[in-house]
Amino acid sequence: MPRTDNDSWAITESVGATALGVAAARAAETESDNPLINDPFARIFVDAAGDGIWSMYTNRTLLAGATDLDPDLRAPIQQMIDFMAARTAFFDEYFLATADAGVRQVVILASGLDSRAWRLPWPDGTVVYELDQPKVLEFKSATLRQHGAQPASQLVNVPIDLRQDWPKALQKAGFDPSKPCAWLAEGLVRYLPARAQDLLFERIDALSRPGSWLASNVPGAGFLDPERMRRQRADMRRMRAAAAKLVETEISDVDDLWYAEQRTAVAEWLRERGWDVSTATLPELLARYGRSIPHSGEDSIPPNLFVSAQRATS
């Protein structure tokens, strides 16, 4: 179903279901022979949600059934796992660096099923604010409570749609704009209209005192190339068709959830406002972690640019 200005979702619906796909990929990587990451909570989320297209990453029977129906699906499924593993490792390392730099205030925007508040070694005094749709945060909190999980930091949930006045809600929840913050916008911006993306980073910039950090992945060069998008959509249709036959449910079209619009170049925008910015393309990031996407699979994963930035202290 196409997006609307005021749409909302639970964890198995619309944008919420994409968080399950990401968690399933993290679970598959964690359980692999040579994992880049260790996320013991990812499998818990996937199992609690039941079967869906995300199950093809973690359910060997469903994966075998899908690849029997369409043998060409095995490669793009593995490529997506590699992508999510590298993405997760990159942002894990980012937060370890911010902690080493003395930042004790963390904001995870559209946190979905991010489990870093539970699994990273946060220094004493760290406060992690998670912002997302109310139903998504409730699913995560309830699922982890049922398994006796305890956050490794002070955790503050801020249930709000990022199209609303989230800075006001964040400060009401205890965020202190006079202190440095480590911001994360992972896997978020392509689900926002271009103007909403601009507003998001304007708000982050306004709330960031010197010593703050920011990390995000944003659409990379060629993201809107019509031929590339056509091939990617064809791959996704095949995956949805196989999943629908195996789990006997309607599988939503993820392409309907993205906003294919020209966007402000985030890295340049931040530099213009005094941030020290570094970037890495997806192939560069995968190579850093010993993974790659073969040429035949380049359309399975949209181009991404990974951005990390620091606001100078003087």
UniProtKB/Swiss-Prot annotation:
Domain of life assignment: Bacteria
Molecular function (Gene Ontology), one example: methyltransferase activity
UniProt keyword Transmembrane helix present: no
Chain residues that bind S-adenosyl-L-methionine: 132, 161-162
Pfam families given in the database record: LCM
Documented EC number(s): 2.1.1.-
Cellular component terms (Gene Ontology): plasma membrane
Keyword Cytoplasm: no
InterPro entries (UniProt xref): Ppm1/Ppm2/Tcmp, SAM-dependent_MTases_sf, SAM_mthyl_Trfase_ML2640-like
GO biological process, one term: methylation
Main enzyme class: transferase
Key words, A-Z: Methyltransferase, S-adenosyl-L-methionine, Transferase
Family listed: Belongs to the UPF0677 family.
Free-text function comment from the UniProt entry: Exhibits S-adenosyl-L-methionine-dependent methyltransferase activity.
Name of the protein described by the UniProt record: Putative S-adenosyl-L-methionine-dependent methyltransferase Rv3767c
Organism encoding this protein: Mycobacterium tuberculosis (strain ATCC 25618 / H37Rv)
Taxonomic classification: Bacteria, Bacillati, Actinomycetota, Actinomycetes, Mycobacteriales
